[in-house]
Amino acid sequence: MNYSRNRAIVFAIVHSNMPLNKASIKFGLSTRQIRRIISKYKKEGAESLLPVSRASKTHANAIQEDIIQRIIILREQLTTGGWDAGAKTIHTYLLKELEPSKVPSISTIWRILQRSGKIIPEPKKRPKTSYIRFQADYPNETWQSDFTHWTISNSEDIEITTWIDDNSRYILNVKAYKTTTVHTIIETFLDSAYKNGLPTSILTDNGLVYTTRLSGGKKRNNQPNSFEQLLDNLGIKAKHGRPAHPTTQGKIERYHQTLKRWLKAQPVAKTIEELNLLLQDFQTLYNQTRPHQSLNNITPTRSLH
């Protein structure tokens, strides 16, 4: 079963209302085959689209007990560490540990986790196929930036600023500040550029630390801020998401979810200095160790280089 093709079929028919006969021609399948894919998707959700290993043709109850236990342990270790712990991620880790012929399929791993009570099926959950994704074609084509809030042990609100490469998902810079300012953005941008070269463009929201283009009401005659002037001097194109459309910066929004899940699994930082040490550890693990599903399960470091 071709997972990417089946995702495209579901997106085309369920979410874009493509006629069945047109889908049959486009994807090279009979209408009966397409109906079967859609029917299974509606009954079982996105997991029904996962590939089934042709090598083993085995079910979850036919897998060796030691492999089942390793799957459960990996799930617990990844969850405790604050990392993604789905069937795809576990499958990637198993491929590093075992001979490929001994690794269960993603769908079998999912069923093992379900049977052990580690996950609950969500057939009505919106599938990832329903999101239209954009990705830069090469590293340093586009960088994304945003900041998010985090609380340290004394209840002080801290802001974490990040720059990521859109193509490779590589974290270029992540640092905590008491307040994110235009100076903060310039400092982190230049530090990223010093280590990785300059990007062709950047993509951010419309926060005033990034742009003044929407400030000043209807007149909008505001002068560009110092960060915008820097970009202009360097010949770097600034792109910004539409107001009330946060999905434009979807990659960095999902990154924030990963970051916060990981931070919650760590000892609570007492100071901003301790938080920045944690962020350095996170950056290393995220870039060099964690497989990224959107990168065909390689790390951002491998994708960048």
What are the roles of these predicted feature ranges?
Residues 2-18, 68, 72-80:
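Short, amphipathic alpha-helical "recognition" segments used to contact nucleic acids or chromatin
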Residues 9, 34-37, 45, 71, ...:
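Mobile genetic element proteins and their domesticated derivatives, centered on retroelements
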Residues 21-27, 90:
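Short alpha-helical "recognition helix" segments of helix-turn-helix
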Residues 36-40, 108-116, 282:
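Residues in the recognition helix of alpha-helical DNA-binding motifs
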Residues 48-142, 222-228, 299-305:
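Basic, flexible linker segments flanking DNA-binding modules
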Residues 107, 111-170, 178-200, 229-233:
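Mobile-element integrase/transposase regions
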Residues 194-219, 242-244, 299-301:
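Acidic/histidine-rich, metal-coordinating catalytic segments
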Residues 220, 227-296, 300-305:
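Charged alpha-helix within mobile-element recombinases
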